[in-house]
Amino acid sequence: MVCLKTLSVFLAAFAAADARAVFKTQSSNKADIIPDSYIVVMKNGVSHDDFKAHVSSVSQIHSNNKAKRGTNTNGMQREFDIMNWRGYHGHFDPDTLDEILNDSKVDYVEHDQIVRISGLVTQRSAPSWGLGRVSHRQAGIRDYVFDDSAGRGVTIYGVDTGIDINHQDFRGRARWGTNTADRDNADRHGHGTHTASTFAGTTYGIAKNANIVAVKVLGSDGSGSTSGIIAGINFCVQDAQSRGILGKAAMNLSLGGGFSQANNDAVTRAQNAGIFVAVAAGNDNKDARNYSPASAPAVCTVASSTVNDSKSSFSNYGSIVDIYAPGSDIIAARPGGGSTTMSGTSMASPHVAGMGAYMIGMGIDPRQVCDRLKQISLPAIRSPGPSTTNRLLYNGSGQ
């Protein structure tokens, strides 16, 4: 009996240890970690009711700990539910965090971290060349040749610094979505308006007839948080679902930060739900596998090319990159009217988002778009980087 009792105690202890959630550590710069700010992801199969009960319990635990210890953490901030992928973000003290990790319904927890735009230098009045390049087999031709459907009936979510939805380049096709960054719905930076103009502008865009939704997740300085981005993605999926446009939607994420499993899981759920997701590879001239959401295998990760079909000097690279697209010296709209020129993988990604909408409008399933774009792409990029594709975005115009 003693042996059996000892064994049962051992097994109980083992089960308890096994039930503890994983605390995932990121490979990013520790300076980008937001203190006491955490993203909690539930295990697959946790029901809506169990999730709500867990959230309520954590809120009560945090409140009790705050009262006892006088901590200044803010507790629960926002919840996520992306096609039954459930989680939340909050500011918690160490004792509350420990309780969360010991809950058997929790899959993993990670630090929230700063995420930034993937754009670089602004050069005014520079020539535009990207549209011509993606519609011709040879470089140097400025005419843009495209099917006149141009994304008609497809909606593109611009997850960025906001969008000037009244800009003349959008001709009334843009609407406001949500803001998870701050209390100012304007695009004070210009990055989001520029990328939206690239994926769906009437003058500067690929999918000239697509609808546009502004999803602000980054502030006027071009930075935000992983939790804010996940909240933005959560909005996109729920909005598309409520409007019946899953399968007729795309999303552009011209942003990135250090590796985040939660960020990768969120974009993967969006992609699997029926939204084509294009993301910037990043601008550090390093392997994109260490960045999120660029490292998510399910999405279309885009590196940046120059007018001479070379890898942009700043562009990240690596086997996770799906395709190259024009990203150096790209002219597009700026808030308040007019245009400006920017460089970065931020400028490459919306070329692919727009082309994805273009393909969806022609009947291709969003979950097959990235593979289709790779199939018709051109083997044009010189010195693409270690273990990196040399394929350049092309719309298959035959030119």
UniProtKB/Swiss-Prot annotation:
Enzyme group, top EC level?
A: hydrolase
Q: Which residues are glycosylated?
A: 252, 308, 395
Supply the residue numbers of the propeptide(s) excised during maturation: 20-118
Annotated compartments? Secreted
- Active site residues according to the UniProt entry: 160, 191, 346
Question: Which Pfam families does this UniProt record tie to the protein?
Answer: Inhibitor_I9, Peptidase_S8
**Which keywords has UniProt assigned to this entry?**
Glycoprotein, Hydrolase, Protease, Secreted, Serine protease, Signal, Virulence, Zymogen
State the SUPFAM superfamilies in the record.
Protease propeptides/inhibitors, Subtilisin-like
User: What does the entry give for GO biological process?
Assistant: proteolysis
Per the record, its GO cellular-component terms are: extracellular region
Q: Which residues form the Peptidase S8 domain?
A: 128-399
Q: Which cysteines are joined by disulfide bonds?
A: none
Q: Span of the secretion signal?
A: 1-19
Provide any one GO MF term from the record: serine-type endopeptidase activity
Q: Which E.C. number(s) belong to this protein?
A: 3.4.21.-
Q: Does the keyword Protease apply?
A: yes
Residue ranges of every copy of the Inhibitor I9 domain listed in the record? 37-117
- State the family it belongs to: Belongs to the peptidase S8 family.
- PANTHER family registered for this protein in UniProt: CEREVISIN-RELATED, PEPTIDASE S8
Write out the function statement from the record: Secreted subtilisin-like serine protease with keratinolytic activity that contributes to pathogenicity.
UniProt-recorded name of the protein? Subtilisin-like protease 4
